[in-house]
Amino acid sequence: MSVKKQLEKLSILGATYHKNGWMPGTAGNLSVRILGESGFWVSGSGLDKNTLNKRNFLYVDLKSGRLSPSKNTKVEKGLKPSAETSIHRAVYCALDDIGCGLHVHTLESNLIRTNTSQHRPVALLELPAIEILKVYGIWKESPKVYVPVIYNFPNVQDISDCLESYLKEYKPVVPFCIIEKHGITVWGKDTVQANRNLEATDFILKYMISSRNLSNPEGKKNFPTENNTSESDRQKVYVAEFPVYPATFL
């Protein structure tokens, strides 16, 4: 698919996500990367996602993180990159087979509370072992699946650095991460797969909120160790709890 077609596809998705309430106001951003190229296209800052067009995307050099002047001659005048551009870059730098990134601010992802902090910036949230996990290619019966939750640093670059380090060290089982009190970033090999993954992710988080299916119902902190986890589950980060605001369920 050509760059033009992919940017048109992202523009359509932006309108859909805005309608779904996943990109309220000007929140969130969308990106594509043509595999083998030295950069990626990402939606600019301060744009309403229900009116995106191909001139609303900037080309960013993957290595430097800077705009590529020769690629941005036809973009909308005055368009600037969002600070969250670095989140997309982190995914592309860590995972070289990824061609699309979707960063949205869903309500459910903002209700998640874990034990992250500036000093412990990554936690693991156990996902429910439900059928929709097959969208991610997980076919094992009753799998133990965790998603990383990243601390919402005031400086977005710190979030990006943390995410990139995690993705490089631990091969992700699911194609998304949660940024606490912020939103989710979902990825895929192309726009079709990334969108499919986002729909599945939204369903899972809605399921968890609706059913109050806490990963640790006794409220005890459960830390994986060398003795109580399998090789695939072994991580150097904490397993998250999943408390939510009480008013959420009134």
Curated annotation (Swiss-Prot):
Reactions listed under catalytic activity: 5-(methylsulfanyl)-D-ribulose 1-phosphate = 5-methylsulfanyl-2,3-dioxopentyl phosphate + H2O
Pathway: Amino-acid biosynthesis; L-methionine biosynthesis via salvage pathway; L-methionine from S-methyl-5-thio-alpha-D-ribose 1-phosphate: step 2/6
Superkingdom of the source species: Bacteria
Keywords annotated in UniProt: Amino-acid biosynthesis, Lyase, Metal-binding, Methionine biosynthesis, Zinc
Gene3D superfamilies for the chain: Class II aldolase/adducin N-terminal domain
SUPFAM superfamilies linked: AraD/HMP-PK domain-like (SSF53639)
A GO BP entry: L-methionine salvage from methylthioadenosine
GO MF, any single term: methylthioribulose 1-phosphate dehydratase activity
Cofactor note: Binds 1 zinc ion per subunit.
Cellular component, GO, one term: cytoplasm
Sequence positions that bind Zn(2+): H103, H105
Record-listed E.C. numbers: 4.2.1.109
Needed cofactors: Zn(2+)
HAMAP family: Salvage_MtnB
Similarity comment text for this entry: Belongs to the aldolase class II family. MtnB subfamily.
Cited function: Catalyzes the dehydration of methylthioribulose-1-phosphate (MTRu-1-P) into 2,3-diketo-5-methylthiopentyl-1-phosphate (DK-MTP-1-P).
Protein name: Methylthioribulose-1-phosphate dehydratase
Organism: Leptospira borgpetersenii serovar Hardjo-bovis (strain JB197)
